[in-house]
From Swiss-Prot:
One of its GO terms (cellular component) is cytosol. Pfam families: PNP_UDP_1. InterPro entries: MTAP, Nucleoside_phosphorylase_d, Nucleoside_phosphorylase_sf. It comes from Streptomyces coelicolor (strain ATCC BAA-471 / A3(2) / M145). NCBIfam families: MTAP (TIGR01694), PRK07823.1 (NF005876), PRK09136.1 (NF006599). It comes from the Bacteria. Phosphate binds at S15, R55, H56, T195. Although this enzyme belongs to the family of MTA phosphorylases based on sequence homology, it lacks several conserved amino acids in the substrate binding pocket that confer specificity towards MTA. Belongs to the PNP/MTAP phosphorylase family. MTAP subfamily. Its EC number is 2.4.2.1. This is Purine nucleoside phosphorylase. It catalyses: a purine D-ribonucleoside + phosphate = a purine nucleobase + alpha-D-ribose 1-phosphate. Purine nucleoside phosphorylase involved in purine salvage.
Length: 280
């Protein structure tokens, strides 16, 4: 039974991925930061132990700005995950990134404003310990090994991905104005979403490998001339592509190295700095 509550890879995604796992065990995990979005669902994918966490909770009841990102990443690490895949829906900021495009970003820009985004905030933990001030590098926020696995998996499924680009993360839950969208595009950014930060930053602080896979579900307001983005259209395009994305995730999981064989810098992100708290 102990094996059933352990995983080496985490996947944070939407409700369309529940059927992703075989032989599923549901596990409730408590964290010093409160409960994660939902239970962890642990099972096997391509012979690998995987923990799936529904980012918005069952029934999609958590808006992006109210997701407990710190608890989510902490929970995944606590069951053994050291590599995390984070698929999410985004809007395309350029006409060439239309609905159905899979973009694997290599950068992000944070335009959120109210989300706790670090474990090292100097505030006491419930047990009284106080984290030290720690500054991790986020120059390259995504795991190079995970990105390579995701790109190879997509190509193997005959879905040519966009290799690289910048994901701008906004607060939500509203969609952007045309002025905001045009400004994002003018900066040279590629896609816009609501959940990519602080996942990547928190994963780095926990020395986890994190890879974002963004599925374009719509052209953002500044890239189209219609009535703007609608939630219904986002859901329709996501549903039309979820099977393909599941297949890419399946193959990416199979291609990731064993946790003890990681050769990327993610596992040494703290660089020997003392976090002042016991990581799970």
């Amino acid at each position: 039974m102990a094996n059933k509550v352990k995983a080496e890879i985490g996947v944070i995604g939407g409700s369309g991925f529940y059927s992703f796992l075989d032989d599923v065990t549901e596990v409730r995990v408590d964290t010093p930061y409160g409960p994660p979005s939902d239970s962890l669902f642990l099972g096997e994918v391509a012979g690998r132990r995987v923990a799936f966490l529904p980012r918005h909770g069952r029934g999609h009841h958590l808006p992006p700005h109210r997701i407990n990102y710190r608890a989510n990443l902490w929970a995944l690490r606590s069951v053994g995950a050291r590599q995390v895949l984070g698929p999410c829906a985004v809007g395309g900021l350029r006409p060439e990134y239309g609905p159905g495009t899979l973009l694997v970003p290599d950068q992000f820009v944070d335009r959120t404003r109210s989300r706790p985004s670090t474990y090292f905030d100097g505030l006491p933990m419930p047990d009284g310990t106080v984290p030290n001030v720690v500054h991790v590098s986020l120059a390259d926020p995504y795991c190079p090994t995970g990105r390579a696995a995701a790109l190879k998996a997509a190509r193997g499924r005959e879905w040519e991905p966009v290799d690289g680009g910048t994901l701008v993360v906004v607060e939500g839950p509203r969609f952007g104005t045309r002025a905001e969208s045009l400004w994002h595009r003018a900066q040279g950014w590629s896609v816009v979403g609501m959940t990519g930060h602080p996942e990547a930053a928190l994963a780095r602080e926990l020395e986890l490998c994190y890879t974002s896979l963004t599925l374009v579900t719509d052209l953002d307001a500044g890239a189209e001339s219609g009535e703007g983005v609608s939630h219904e259209e986002v859901l329709r395009v996501f549903a039309a592509n979820v099977d393909r994305l599941r297949g890419v995730l399946f193959d990416a999981v199979a291609a990731l190295p064993a946790s003890g064989e990681r050769d990327c810098p993610c596992g040494a992100a703290l660089g020997g700095m003392d976090p002042g708290i016991a990581l799970p």
